[in-house]
């Protein structure tokens, strides 16, 4: 049966929505190669983004999650038929009947494509995740696509490649959970390159946290320097002690001055001044897995181990982008030299600021030497009594 006939057959059935969703995913995975899927998903996404911005130009700078929820996707598909062949139009019509929108379907397909490589018939014995720091080990992997390590996830207890495990955890947390659809066309960054990983050590280690580490020579793919995070919409807020720390760390040819009028101008100056580029990186996609309580613990432990691993590897400063309230609240409670903001922006106009900032790895290591999980939670509880993040921290 062809793709078109399979879609017609599915459209004519009266199945429960969850069954129909799974059947549609299976059809796409069966008839399209990974390369064909990638091309199709990106083409339709680009066309629908263009259609939506033509209707709502005031949403030009909003995230894809906001943009794709502006109107009923079924109406969008009918009002603006895609300009590809009939099979694709029928596919999109069927997607619109089964999923909230195209990006939700894309994410579901990527998750299922990974899971179908590994049968749950080969599931690992049930694992109880510990709250003891000594049960975990942390390391930096130069290129996870070349690693022979096999790990499992709390959400999917089957031995799989490290690159698939990292990609699956990123999809489940950031895309499926937090609707960060911008990751989808850049999913390959979760499948290769340098990553920090945190494992519960056992016969088949359990991957409980990971983060993408990009060196200075990869800054063309840094999110910090992408247009959405490096525009005039961003409020520049680097504090005086931030300048002092960056100048003190011996990574610059000459001191930064304190009169940069915008984040964009500061970024340009930093790139001009930096000489010891091997000591600077960007850290993104800090992912944790498990139950709600375990995620909070792994967020604590992952930060603690991440700072130590990167500092021991010769890094002094890390660029990062944070919206996570627990992390921001904790940073307000510690030495202001350990983490400081460089800019912030309410990207979606929903009252939630996203922050760009710097980790000073040596100071962060010192902070976590004095902070156990109980103290971490206590600090967060105290800071949560305040209603705002201090953008000058």
Swiss-Prot record:
What Pfam family is a match, any one? Answer: AHL_synthase
Q: What class of enzyme is it?
A: transferase
Q: What Enzyme Commission number(s) does the record list for this chain?
A: 2.3.1.184
Q: GO BP, one example?
A: quorum sensing
Q: Its Gene Ontology molecular function terms?
A: N-acyl homoserine lactone synthase activity
Q: InterPro entries per the record? A: AHL_synthase
Q: Which UniProt keywords apply?
A: Autoinducer synthesis, Quorum sensing, S-adenosyl-L-methionine, Transferase
What chemistry does it catalyse, as a reaction equation?
Answer: a fatty acyl-[ACP] + S-adenosyl-L-methionine = an N-acyl-L-homoserine lactone + S-methyl-5'-thioadenosine + holo-[ACP] + H(+)
Give the top-rank taxon of the lineage listed in the UniProt record for this protein.
Answer: Bacteria
**Which family, according to the similarity comment?**
Belongs to the LuxM / VanM family.
What protein is this chain from? Acyl-homoserine-lactone synthase OpaM
Q: Which species does this protein come from? A: Vibrio parahaemolyticus serotype O3:K6 (strain RIMD 2210633)
- Gene label: opaM
């Amino acid at each position: 049966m062809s793709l078109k006939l399979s879609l017609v057959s599915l459209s004519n059935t009266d199945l429960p929505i969850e069954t129909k969703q799974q059947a549609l995913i299976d059809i796409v995975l069966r008839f399209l190669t990974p390369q064909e899927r990638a091309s199709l998903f990106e083409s339709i996404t680009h066309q629908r983004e263009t259609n939506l911005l033509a209707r709502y130009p005031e949403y030009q700078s909003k995230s894809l999650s906001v943009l794709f929820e502006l109107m009923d996707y079924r109406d969008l598909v009918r009002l603006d038929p895609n300009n590809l062949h009939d099979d694709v139009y029928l596919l999109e019509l069927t997607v619109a009947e089964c999923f909230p929108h195209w990006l939700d379907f894309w994410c579901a397909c990527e998750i299922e494509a990974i899971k179908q490589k590994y049968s749950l018939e080969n599931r690992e014995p049930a694992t109880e995740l510990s709250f003891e720091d000594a049960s975990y080990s942390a390391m930096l992997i130069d290129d996870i696509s070349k690693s022979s390590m096999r790990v499992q996830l709390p959400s999917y207890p089957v031995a799989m490649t490290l690159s698939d495990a990292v990609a699956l955890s990123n999809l489940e947390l950031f895309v499926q959970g937090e609707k960060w659809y911008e990751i989808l066309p850049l999913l390959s960054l979760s499948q290769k390159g340098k990553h920090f990983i945190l494992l519960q050590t056992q016969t088949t280690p359990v991957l409980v946290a990971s983060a993408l580490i990009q060196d200075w020579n990869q800054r063309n793919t840094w999110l910090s320097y992408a247009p959405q995070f490096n525009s005039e919409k961003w409020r520049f807020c680097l504090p005086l002690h931030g300048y002092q720390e960056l100048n003190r760390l011996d990574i610059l040819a000459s001191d930064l001055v304190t009169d940069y009028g915008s984040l964009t101008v500061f970024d340009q100056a930093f790139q001009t001044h930096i000489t010891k580029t091997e000591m600077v990186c960007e850290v993104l996609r800090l992912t944790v897995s498990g139950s709600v309580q375990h995620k909070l613990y792994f967020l604590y432990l992952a930060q603690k181990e991440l700072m130590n691993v990167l500092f021991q590897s010769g890094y002094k400063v890390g660029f990062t982008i944070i919206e996570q309230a627990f992390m921001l609240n904790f940073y307000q409670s510690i030495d202001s030299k350990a983490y400081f903001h460089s800019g912030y922006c309410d990207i979606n106009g929903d009252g939630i600021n996203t922050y760009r900032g710097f980790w000073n790895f040596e100071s962060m290591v010192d902070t976590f030497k004095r902070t156990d999980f109980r103290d971490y939670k206590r600090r967060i509880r105290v800071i949560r009594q305040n209603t705002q993040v201090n953008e000058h921290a």
